[in-house]
Amino acid sequence: MLTGKEIREKYLRFFEQRGHQILPSASLIPHNDPSILWTAAGMVPFKPFFTGQAVPEYQRVTTCQKCIRTPDIESVGRTARHHTFFEMLGNFSFGDYFKESIIPWAWEFITKELNLPKEKLWITIYQDDDEAFEIWNKVVGIPSERIVRLGKDTNFWEIGVGPCGPCSEIYVDLGEARGCGSPECQVGCDCDRFLEIWNLVFIQFFRDEEGNYSPLENKGIDTGMGLERVASVLQGVASNFDTDIFREIMDFTANLAGQEYGQKADIDLALKVIADHCRAVTFAVSDGALPGNEGRGYVIRRLLRRAVRFGRVLGVREPFLYKVAQAVIKQMQDAYPELKQKAEHVLRVIRTEEERFLETLAAGSDILSALINEAKASGASEITGDDAFKLYDTFGFPLELTQEIAEEQGLAVDVEVFNAAMEEQRKRARSARQETEYLSERGVLYKALREELGETRFIGYSALEADSNIMALLKDGMQEISAVAGEEVEIVLDVTPCYAESGGQVADHAILRGPDLEVEITSVNKPVEGLVIHRGKVLSGIIKRHDSVKAIVDQPRRQDTARNHSATHLLHKALKEVLGDHVNQAGSLVEPDRLRFDFTHYAAVTSEELRRIEEIVNEAVLSNLSIEVFETSLSKAKEMGAAALFGEKYGKQVRVVKMGDFSMELCGGTHLTSTAEVGLFKIFNETSVGAGLRRIEAVTGTGVLKYLKAKEEQLEEIASVIKSPMHELVRRSEALVQQNKSLEQEIEALRNKLAKSEVQDILGNIKRAKEVPVLASVVAAPDMDNLRGMVDMLRDKMGSGVILLGSTAGEKVNLVAAVTKDLHGQGLHAGNLVKEIAKMVGGGGGGRPDMAQAGGKNPEKLQEAIDQVCRVVEGQIK
């Protein structure tokens, strides 16, 4: 029996012997292809070669490609074949061999290398592919009755925009016992009898965004054999999950949870889902993906959270997925060395995300359980969309998870109302942004101006001044002939040296100067591609449409901005060196006085890491690296290794910014000519801006001197306040902290003493409600912790009874209630009691039957509310 590892090796060696270069798997994150989230097939990394956009180094290639597909996440574990992560064995020809070679090779491999019985093999071809039929029938010798012609839905391969073509599939007949029993059952039937193990795609066409097909200049071959699927056939098991590829991970998980595979259906399902999802997450994170709320980050988060949920089915309540990930790494690291290299990072990301979700799960699950119980008690058949949205919006509880848990309890979720609530939230967000967005009418005007005037010519990379003509003049969104001093205007020039805000870099400031007129420009942007709008104020004279002016950029401001932009590139590279290759730019702001850089990372950057990042940037600055800026083709830039932003749309020609051998990125911003011009680099803030996202803020050049001067002044002020010389600040501060700690301990001891005294005093105020001891009082407790402590002391002394204490803190009311366990059977519930009393002081709250707390905002009504406690208790006693 061949193992998964042996099948992988046998396949690659077979094609290596036939002139193919073995290449390592490409990343799961597609390189410079924003049209897809994941590498979902073996040919994805080779699309440019099939389309002619790039020239391959090798004409024949074979790979075992890591793949992720997520359309059917819910089916994972419930069927024999569905996976989110899988390995695709493939061989490729870029304008070299075609059908005449791959078809005989495929037959040779499966019948001689894998020793599959010929009588169990069937072939499908595209209905119009007579060429493939002839090769299978005449050259290979497959009887015509075992070659099945099928339509485009099954035998024409395409994944949206890109290379495509007819395909031929090889099927294995697994026997009548696996079939549907129909006498008409044959290849193409939806049952499990005929299993497709290899797809041979004949790349002949390119499909565009409109769905049109055009012949490719270079025909090619793309084949795909699912490793997990063929392993199930060769190992004689009914499910991919029963192959050695999965069983090793599933057995590890079962042992971890104290469970056994093959005994209970729900346990088996959980083990399968966890194994699948953990494989996907482990590989994705090793390739640079991080959990998040959008795009591939959302996919990773969803898979992790589903796996955690299924861990609870196994009885696991603590973080465990990182341990399963260790098993995945151990099993797969020989074939994929990057797993071992990134192991520490992968395990840390998974554990951090799992711990965060367990906190979310604890809070959300309790509320969802209550909602489910309420729905069942009222005879409802679903959880309301509003409740599902509240769980999502308040606790981060995913809709999919709410649906799964509700479904287990026989309930649905009103997704329509949930979606409506989501859309309403989006509308509110859009409304909040309207003040900074252009009105739709103005957008129409800009588009018309672009069509009428053509493109604004930008010369600002090489010049800071330009003789220009005013092509259009706008005031308040309307075209005007002229404007006078004091008026705010928008101006379109035929040529401009002004950089328009884009790519995170702020716009230039400038002066437009003409005979007897001057306009101050404080904003430049491109509301429509190709049209540059200059916004500013007329300082003197009268400006008219068609006037000739000289546009003069504020050179010091431009230089300061360029200094920070170049430093941003150095920072990006330094972050990757210190934190790892998973770091990617997620946003930036480049201004004259500072820079802000958002990036993907799973944890706060430590002080030591920040120091090292600063050192690396300043070393690059002091190295006086030459900064080269040049234009080239996108394909050439990729070959050179220039970094690009995922999701950014690039044209065929791109602008590359290269800083010695240290950094190379695609960038349209303005830059220095040497890194030495950065002067100095200093990070002044690092913080979180979302799950898996961090932000660094920094200054450069004279900004560093200003920053250090401000810090020095702060230290001088602190020294003055605590009456200490500068050189003794640390020692004096430590002494003050210790003194403060001692005083706090003394205060706490006094508070406890006072609390005990007050507790003793109010014990004489016990009343009875239907023979139940009730103690209710207003006390002097500075905060909720002290109030709870007093309630605990009273409960210990009373032994049996109901206690409710209230205190004020400024304009707030604090309430704590307790009910001893012997009274729970009489209908008394601390949460219900405190909730009722809290209403009387304008607040709310609740909690457990034995202890609960609440707050209010009407301290003047506290005594009145306390006086009602006995009455409320009487009403609750059964």
From Swiss-Prot:
CDD domains: AlaRS_core. Binds 1 zinc ion per subunit. PROSITE patterns: AA_TRNA_LIGASE_II_ALA. GO terms for molecular function: alanine-tRNA ligase activity; aminoacyl-tRNA deacylase activity; ATP binding; catalytic activity, acting on a protein; transferase activity; tRNA binding; zinc ion binding. It catalyses: tRNA(Ala) + L-alanine + ATP = L-alanyl-tRNA(Ala) + AMP + diphosphate. It is found in: Cytoplasm. Zn(2+) binds at H565, H569, C667, H671. The keyword Lyase does not apply. Keywords: Aminoacyl-tRNA synthetase, ATP-binding, Cytoplasm, Ligase, Metal-binding, Nucleotide-binding, Protein biosynthesis, RNA-binding, tRNA-binding, Zinc. Its cofactor is Zn(2+). The keyword Glycoprotein does not apply. GO terms for cellular component: cytosol. Its main location: cytoplasm. Its EC number is 6.1.1.7. It comes from the Bacteria. GO terms for biological process: alanyl-tRNA aminoacylation. It is an enzyme of class 6 (ligase). Consists of three domains; the N-terminal catalytic domain, the editing domain and the C-terminal C-Ala domain. The editing domain removes incorrectly charged amino acids, while the C-Ala domain, along with tRNA(Ala), serves as a bridge to cooperatively bring together the editing and aminoacylation centers thus stimulating deacylation of misacylated tRNAs. Belongs to the class-II aminoacyl-tRNA synthetase family. Catalyzes the attachment of alanine to tRNA(Ala) in a two-step reaction: alanine is first activated by ATP to form Ala-AMP and then transferred to the acceptor end of tRNA(Ala). Also edits incorrectly charged Ser-tRNA(Ala) and Gly-tRNA(Ala) via its editing domain. This is Alanine--tRNA ligase.
